């Protein structure tokens, strides 16, 4: 939820992928 590297389906995630 807080940090999903490559799971944009989560509620909030860091911008690891452009």
UniProtKB/Swiss-Prot annotation:
Belongs to the PP3/GlyCAM-1 family. This is Glycosylation-dependent cell adhesion molecule 1. The gene is GLYCAM1. It comes from Lama glama. One of its GO terms (cellular component) is extracellular region.
């Amino acid at each position: 939820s807080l940090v999903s590297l490559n799971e944009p389906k989560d509620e909030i995630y860091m911008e690891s992928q452009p």
